[in-house]
């Protein structure tokens, strides 16, 4: 790669690093900025990127990508920690949204966490009810749509395989996106069932397979994101009701924190992508203005 273009890659890396550090600083518990510490971090980052000049250009791109992803994950983990500790009220971050789902999702409004007009959930609901709710969702015109289905879908017998399920789910998602193309859709993984729930339906043993299929669908669908609840389901297993199906009031803040952290993660990734694109555009302009050495 020509020297000038190679240096542009390093410059782009510096810009991205500075932006990520600036955003991370805003996550401080008291909102204070330690200028000296921030400057030291930036200086270390610049020194690191300058040292990359001795490396192969193909390796540099991968190293910078890994650094960005690591930093984004650290910021995501810090936000989750702040939400879990109560430093930030998770409910204050639910803005311009709609949440749809089954009886488990009903708890968000039943326990008074979120307003009823933003929680379109019913006991026994499946994604077929979601399809019926599309006009209501469109009327609210939300930026973020949270979908919390799956418990009844797995046991009802309409979709005998995970593949059958996501095939119809994808069609419904496409219907929503056709009318709300700018909305982000966040699909909650299916919370597990626990004993004695399996006495009611052994199909719930297959919940992990259905969730995995939903993840695959999200991975291949633009503006559709999978929210993995496995970690919080394991950590707060004691917050399931005695029926092994529903969850107690105290579980909802943890579930909400997981949902809203994914929204935050997507916003970070979008900001990172925009910064990278801006840096690349600047590189293209410089390349056209000056010949490579």
Task: Outline where the language-model segments fall.
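Acidic/histidine-rich helix-loop elements
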Residues: 112-130, 155-162
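N-terminal secretory targeting modules
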Residues: 1-94, 110, 266-293
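Oxyanion-hole/transition-state-stabilizing segment in secreted/luminal serine hydrolases
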Residues: 107, 133-166, 186, 190-197
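Charged helix-capping and loop-helix junction motifs
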Residues: 162-171, 203-210
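Catalytic His-Asp segment of secreted/periplasmic serine-dependent ester chemistry enzymes
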Residues: 193-293
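Active-site-proximal beta-strand/loop segments in catalytic clefts of secreted hydrolases
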Residues: 100-103, 120-123, 148-152, 188-192, ...
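Alpha-helical scaffolding within the catalytic cores
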Residues: 127-138, 170-175
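N-terminal post-signal-peptidase region of extra-cytosolic proteins
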Residues: 78-86, 124-134
